[in-house]
């Protein structure tokens, strides 16, 4: 070779081209980044990182391959005047190790040393073949700063990415109580529907003992009777509101006030026909309005069994009860 000086990089710039031997990566990092390019952000940050960032548990065996191959690289290039072969074992001798690009695990594939080097780079390095597999993580930087987290039982031994523990319940805490599934629609017989309607005409709200007694008498569940009364009260309140609006009243008359906390439920369920017509002029106007089955239905009815089961009673309740039974068990209040 006629110009051996052209193949060797200047002595003042090798630290800028690639890391010094003091920043030689441990064996675990060599195996982790053996298949990746050297222009990754992690590699560039690692090159400019001072030696204090390296973990304390770096094996000293990772520095032995460059010391063994440094004299052979100097003999091949013919530039033995830059240093003695024994000087490659020192940690600060960057010119000697800069001449052996193929022996370094952090060799830049497209760097100046690779372009000017005469020997082609081998695919696998002896240091990579002799390095044992990592014990816990592929990144030994976790061993220092994340020591208390790695010792936790959440992380498996062969995991290279820190997993999210699955035992934390805070992502599910905001959902609240799990919602029940949709209940099946109950199908009531004519006898059950008439008995429920008869009880509803007596009292709009039924107590728990009476509800359980009625459910056992009709062969129904307590929840079915409860849902039926809720849906029935909702329909009755809506029809009462439409009645007042059609008779020239206002919607606020159906809302509870301080003087009358229960305008719709208590007044209609407890008073007779004469008292209701005298006290509520809006209702009397509605009764003298043109005949409407819905208006006639909402009038106060006596609690006698003969009246509730009379053939002249409108069948609006029985026709629309099936539509109410499919609603949810939550009562919607009109406000």
UniProtKB/Swiss-Prot annotation:
Compartments, record wording: Nucleus
DNA-binding annotation, residue ranges on this chain: 181-240
Induction line: By Pax6.
Domain of life of the organism encoding this protein: Eukaryota
Keyword terms of this UniProt record: Developmental protein, DNA-binding, Homeobox, Nucleus
Biased composition (Low complexity): 83-95, 299-317
SMART domains: HOX
Protein name, per record: Homeobox protein DBX1
